[in-house]
């Protein structure tokens, strides 16, 4: 077993060897290096062929038509394209957008930008378990609501929102529905023929593909429309200009094909490791809280708060495992996770949370090592904590008045 142990698969995944092998075929002079948009010679035709195959592979994972897949530089761009693109296209109908407070920053900040452009955005609260109250969502919908954007799987908690029901609600009211599926592709079965979703964002690097490539599903029937955000040569049916990065797209396509092939195997493997991790940590430690809901979440993300331990010192104490507190995009700030705050967790618990994310290459040995390391580290840090001592003595910390110096 090699240290440090990687348990941050929700931040990014290593590229699968099978994927890297395919990508290598599309880079050098004796490989498939042509520009897929070059129509006048074989180099272009061959590149176009593998790009078409990649498009089909991405579409197959979600049961879409390949013509509904628009390649982008990642889920952040896909979210921007869907939300800004749809809001601008449908603005004559209305300027109201609904999203949730626990969305990824790529959705929240895109909505903030639209507010600066005169749109009105409702950021919905979630329940204590991280899920939306669908009745409240229905009550928030108005005649001038043009778009609802709700993520499929939350990147910090792993909870799975009820996309099927939300889709029905939106379709009934003729509201466009966007779903950020960066964390659910390859982990939850997605069938866009069954789901009433208009736009769906995907990322390559969350599914053992390369970074820097993503996709946006844009429904054809009934047709979903959007305004392009990137202008140029009219690539991707005018929705996203820019030379197609053949090796990146082939990487994403292969990753999605492998995800489909290995779905059952990955799910069983990760579910068993999740149980081992949760049982190991939650069984004989007190003041340990599971964030989210265990019965409606993906097995790969486990978010736990350890009371009476400061998050930053905890991360430093467990430097032999690569985990995160909050999401990678915001872990550079010392603010507590806005997602955990939205669940109603107090600052102390939000600060002492750790997200373990398990993946295809995680082993039982690594999980067992992690459990032991967590137990020892938490025990050691709590021994140094005066708050833990007071708690042990039965003092209600909320009733303590601290002296101000």
Swiss-Prot record:
It comes from the Bacteria. Belongs to the class-V pyridoxal-phosphate-dependent aminotransferase family. NifS/IscS subfamily. It is an enzyme of class 2 (transferase). GO terms for cellular component: L-cysteine desulfurase complex. Master enzyme that delivers sulfur to a number of partners involved in Fe-S cluster assembly, tRNA modification or cofactor biosynthesis. Catalyzes the removal of elemental sulfur atoms from cysteine to produce alanine. Functions as a sulfur delivery protein for Fe-S cluster synthesis onto IscU, an Fe-S scaffold assembly protein, as well as other S acceptor proteins. The modification N6-(pyridoxal phosphate)lysine is found at residue 206. The gene is iscS. This is Cysteine desulfurase IscS. GO terms for biological process: [2Fe-2S] cluster assembly. It is found in: Cytoplasm. The keyword Amino-acid biosynthesis does not apply. PANTHER family: CYSTEINE DESULFURASE, CYSTEINE DESULFURYLASE FAMILY MEMBER. Pathway: Cofactor biosynthesis; iron-sulfur cluster biosynthesis. The active site is at residue 329.
